[in-house]
Amino acid sequence: MVVASLSGNTRELGRMIAGHCRAAGHAVYWQEADAADPSEALAADQADLVLLGSWTDNAGRTPSEMKAWIAATAERGQRPAQVAVFGTGETQWGQEYYCGAVQRLIRYFNSTYPPLRIEQMPHGERHAAAIAEWTAAVLAHYWSTADADHQRHHA
């Protein structure tokens, strides 16, 4: 799991998702997109599934720290095969920009996984249910793919 979080909202969302993944028996390797030493994390191409979490910058853009992580991963030849994307955003800036980074990342990685978009900080039963349902859907989609390595259980 790679997370870019400005205010902590996306980080908290990632922690909640990681908890659901661990509860389902998956190993979760956590990395901040702007980590000074990314060598401690599992290489992106070694993970069965990479979960990318991002906040959205001005006008629906992907923040620079996530772009830098993607560029560094590509330079090392570690483009992940399977990517699911989640993020937080604010509708006050307009629906056309709301969680724009999520959509951009999905397009960039040609992800077939459903997106998860949460308004600001995840809270309450409605968000908890949406997060649990999304995580279950992502894991079900992962298990349905023909090229997944079901023995390693790395997310």
Feature map (PLM): residue ranges:
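FMN-binding flavodoxin-like domain, especially the glycine-rich phosphate-binding loop
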Residues: E12, H20, A24, Y29, ...
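Short glycine-biased active-site loop of nucleotidyltransferases that positions the nucleotide triphosphate
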Residues: E40-A44
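Short acidic loop-to-helix transition motifs that present clustered carboxylates
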Residues: E32-S39
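N-terminal beta1-alpha1 ligand-phosphate binding loop
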Residues: M1-R22
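Flexible, glycine-rich phosphate/dinucleotide-binding loops
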Residues: G8, D37, Q92
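Cofactor-binding loop segments of dinucleotide-utilizing enzymes, especially the Rossmann-like FAD-
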Residues: V3-L6, A33, T88-E90
